[in-house]
Amino acid sequence: MRKQKRKEHLRFTVDKAVSTYLFNDSISLNEVGLTRHLKGQSITYELLEESLETYQKLIDHEETREKVVVLAEHYLRDYYKDQLLKGRWSKRMNTLYYIEDFKMRSLADTIWMLFQTHSKWDEEKEQIIRTLAALQDVRLFGMLVEEQPDWSVGLYKEIFRRMDRDQFKYNVSELDSFEHPVGHAMLDVAREERDEDLLPLFEDLLSSHSLEVRIRALKGILALERITKVELLTSFASSSEWVERMLFARIAGKLKQSRYISILNELMGDSNWWVRQGAAEALFHYRDGVLILEHIHTNHPDPFARDMARQWVGSRDSVSDGGC
């Protein structure tokens, strides 16, 4: 009971000191007064971590969030360095998470050293990499482009999502080939960004001899819902790969250009269900899409096309009737 009371008293003391510094511009770092509570007491460090993490999640004000980082750097840097070098596995992992959350760039050299010396590939190694990415470590970013290590696409995506956007665009511009996991991940994250500055890249990669790259380029154009070189799309309607035909149909549905209607009509009779589905959905979103689908349902020579058109016209009727 006494131990719990002491812990709650410490929690109150820590929270009060943190909030006073964060929300009072007249209080300097030297006036926070936490140093004497931290000496040799790991519980106080843990309470400080919890307090800073809570405020960081609750606060949107950029200057106040920066003060959270200042507090973390001032009070936790040496403690974290000691945990990284001497702590048990669970402590090291938690420390890496907190360093990432608090963006403690002063510890980047220590973590880079761990990256170089940690030979075993495990969860800790991957978190070291994620933390370096969150700290915007240019040594890691340079290595990705120059060496393209054989890491998973998933890990690469986690790295690129942590990059500053300008740094990400720079790395994209520096990559010679997108045919490896690092390139695949870059294109996936570029699509997530929906940044129109990357549209020329997607358009250029439509001519790649790699199916994986072409698919990612098509998905990027689909996400942006625009293209400047419309002539580049048409050939994908007759691709031997069904996924490219499907993506053509979906993009055509976003662009809604009349030049694609006859092609979509043909794709309604495609041998692949996903392509037929994509073509029907695309036509459905054209201005006269329902009329076009009704015509296909009545006149298309392919029974699969007629059936798909019937389903989409029926879905319109179902919505109009309130689903009854």
Where are these regions (language model features)?
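N-terminal topogenic membrane-targeting module
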Residues: 1-86, 93
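Amphipathic alpha-helical scaffolding segments comprising HEAT/armadillo-like alpha-solenoid repeats
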Residues: 35-39, 71-84, 104-116, 137-147, ...
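Membrane-interacting alpha-helical segments
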Residues: 49-61, 244, 274-275, 302-306
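Long, mid-chain structured domain cores
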Residues: 50, 59, 66-131, 136-138
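Structural detector for internal amphipathic alpha-helices that build alpha-solenoid repeat scaffolds
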Residues: 62-71, 93-102, 124-135, 153-165, ...
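Short inter-helical turns and helix N-cap capping residues of alpha-solenoid HEAT/ARM repeat scaffolds
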Residues: 87-88, 117-121, 148-152, 178-180, ...
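Extended hydrophobic secondary-structure segments
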Residues: 267, 275-276
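Alpha-helical oligomerization segments
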Residues: 293-295, 300-308, 315
